[in-house]
Amino acid sequence: MKFAVLVFPGSNCDRDMFNAAIKSGVEAEYVDYRETSLSGFDGVLIPGGFSFGDYLRSGAMASVAPIISEVKRLAAEGKPVLGVCNGFQILTEIGLLPGALLHNDSHLFISRNEELEIVNNQTAFTNLYEQGEKVIYPVAHGEGHYYCTDEIYQQLKANNQIILKYVNNPNGSYDDIAGIVNEKGNVCGMMPHPERALETLLGTDSGVKLFEAMVKSWREQHV
């Protein structure tokens, strides 16, 4: 398995994403936003940061980058796509995930570890966690308030697309939502950073199982 780690101007978590992929036992390669092909890749990791300086709004300019059409193609083919923080914002901008990310209710940038609950462990991203398991991931965002209409929220609940919730909601997200998947279950977006939760020495290794779950799910289908 080989992951593409996208790099935009202003990305600052691409190295963490790369290391997370390698730690899970697969290959990874950085891919510049100006590229027009993701041939040879089995999945996509869209890192956090401030793509294009977050001008217009977070993820807006990245959403029209040349590489995005290939991200959509891989998603349509059922390949795993994970967007974290700014990556989640980009996935909502390009329509691969519903909803939007708004300014935190506090209007402050929040940077700290947060306790989260796995509320759906039947996905390609969470199948190594226990249902209801509590995990610790770092958060680092100013626009992490997940918002959606009541209609979309009901669809998310009906389709079991909400996978991760905050225990102590730090940003005002609708129903404490921290992470979701698309209906097919192969595209995932979350504001917390599992790629920064790989070492107990640094405070938490709760993120290890998320990347291992992605690899496990892919191998079950292809090996």
Swiss-Prot record:
Report keywords, A-Z.
Answer: ATP-binding, Cytoplasm, Glutamine amidotransferase, Hydrolase, Ligase, Nucleotide-binding, Purine biosynthesis
* Lineage of source species: Bacteria, Bacillati, Bacillota, Bacilli, Bacillales
Transmembrane helix is among the record's keywords? no
Question: Mind telling me which Pfam families this protein's record contains?
Answer: GATase_5
E.C. number: 6.3.5.3, 3.5.1.2
Q: Name one GO molecular function term.
A: phosphoribosylformylglycinamidine synthase activity
Q: Where in the cell is it found?
A: Cytoplasm
Catalyzed reactions: N(2)-formyl-N(1)-(5-phospho-beta-D-ribosyl)glycinamide + L-glutamine + ATP + H2O = 2-formamido-N(1)-(5-O-phospho-beta-D-ribosyl)acetamidine + L-glutamate + ADP + phosphate + H(+); L-glutamine + H2O = L-glutamate + NH4(+)
Q: Which HAMAP family match?
A: PurQ
Organism field: Staphylococcus aureus (strain NCTC 8325 / PS 47)
Q: What residues does the Glutamine amidotransferase type-1 domain cover? A: 3-223
Report the SS bond pairs: none
- Active site at which residues? 85, 193, 195
Would I find ATP-binding among this entry's keywords?
yes
Biological role stated in the UniProt entry: Part of the phosphoribosylformylglycinamidine synthase complex involved in the purines biosynthetic pathway. Catalyzes the ATP-dependent conversion of formylglycinamide ribonucleotide (FGAR) and glutamine to yield formylglycinamidine ribonucleotide (FGAM) and glutamate. The FGAM synthase complex is composed of three subunits. PurQ produces an ammonia molecule by converting glutamine to glutamate. PurL transfers the ammonia molecule to FGAR to form FGAM in an ATP-dependent manner.
- Gene Ontology terms: biological process: 'de novo' IMP biosynthetic process
Q: Which InterPro entries match?
A: Class_I_gatase-like (IPR029062), PRibForGlyAmidine_synth_PurQ (IPR010075)
Give the domain of life: Bacteria
The record's note on quaternary structure and interaction partners says: Part of the FGAM synthase complex composed of 1 PurL, 1 PurQ and 2 PurS subunits.
Q: Give the protein's recorded name.
A: Phosphoribosylformylglycinamidine synthase subunit PurQ
**Which pathway does the protein contribute to?**
Purine metabolism; IMP biosynthesis via de novo pathway; 5-amino-1-(5-phospho-D-ribosyl)imidazole from N(2)-formyl-N(1)-(5-phospho-D-ribosyl)glycinamide: step 1/2
GO cellular component terms, semicolon-separated: cytoplasm
